[in-house]
UniProtKB/Swiss-Prot annotation:
Protein name listed in UniProt: Deoxyuridine 5'-triphosphate nucleotidohydrolase
Leading EC class: hydrolase
Pfam families: dUTPase (PF00692)
UniProt keyword Transport present: no
Known catalytic reactions: dUTP + H2O = dUMP + diphosphate + H(+)
Signal peptide coordinates: none
Function: This enzyme is involved in nucleotide metabolism: it produces dUMP, the immediate precursor of thymidine nucleotides and it decreases the intracellular concentration of dUTP so that uracil cannot be incorporated into DNA.
Organism of this sequence: Mesorhizobium japonicum (strain LMG 29417 / CECT 9101 / MAFF 303099)
Lineage of source species: Bacteria, Pseudomonadati, Pseudomonadota, Alphaproteobacteria, Hyphomicrobiales
Amino acid sequence: MRAALQNSSVIGPTVGFVRLPHAEGLPLPAYESTGAAGMDLRAAVPDDRPLLILPGKRSLVPTGLILEIPEGMEGQVRPRSGLAFKHGLTVLNSPGTVDSDYRGEVKVLLINLGDEDFAVTRGMRIAQIVFAVVTQAAVEERSLAGGTARGSGGFGSTGTV
């Protein structure tokens, strides 16, 4: 297993991670390569009770982590490409948003789109989290929307495939 990179070389805001009792012994999220955008989230399920997700079914998987995300940022929970490609397992509400003021346990909503049962085991890397800057927009009601060359065309109207 490749050792995760130390975060000491990362320049950016600090995100606090609180490890809950059922996540004891699991590694904290870390960047796995110098160019990685996301940190892997692991399943904090009991060793003796893997979580079985049947084809077409979904399950909320605990990570055993509470995050302290700086104001003005969010955590985006995204699928891991290998799980999606090899097993059809993906994050149902992708990207799932973890707001900066949320202080509950981060859980990952997984769905099995594959043809076989999938067992989520303790410590399995089930998703990734990407931290991003967000802004809050001011709301201004208008009677008409300003015109553009595109207009109201959508769903393939730009001619790109």
